[in-house]
Amino acid sequence: MKVRASVKPICEKCKVIKRKGKVMVICENPKHKQKQG
């Protein structure tokens, strides 16, 4: 999980979602998981 100011999809399988008001990226590749902090 990476915590970043700007959350962007890295590959085609990355999905940008909102959970509890925070923007997150979920992906098949665990290295691509990000959340906004």
UniProtKB/Swiss-Prot annotation:
Assigned keywords, A-Z: Ribonucleoprotein, Ribosomal protein
Top-level taxon of the source organism: Bacteria
InterPro entries referenced in this protein's UniProt entry, alphabetically: Ribosomal_bL36 (IPR000473), Ribosomal_bL36_sp (IPR035977)
Cellular component GO terms held in the UniProt record: cytoplasm; ribonucleoprotein complex; ribosome
Pfam families (alphabetical): Ribosomal_L36 (PF00444)
SUPFAM superfamilies: Ribosomal protein L36
Record-level GO BP terms: translation
GO MF term list: structural constituent of ribosome
PROSITE patterns: RIBOSOMAL_L36
Keyword Ribonucleoprotein part of the UniProt annotation: yes
Coiled coil region boundaries: none
Cysteines joined through disulfide linkages: none
PANTHER family: 50S RIBOSOMAL PROTEIN L36, CHLOROPLASTIC (PTHR42888), LARGE RIBOSOMAL SUBUNIT PROTEIN BL36C (PTHR42888:SF1)
HAMAP family: Ribosomal_bL36 (MF_00251)
NCBIfam families listed in its UniProt record: rpmJ_bact
Family: Belongs to the bacterial ribosomal protein bL36 family.
Protein name as catalogued: Large ribosomal subunit protein bL36
Origin species: Alkaliphilus metalliredigens (strain QYMF)
Name of the gene encoding the protein in the UniProt record: rpmJ
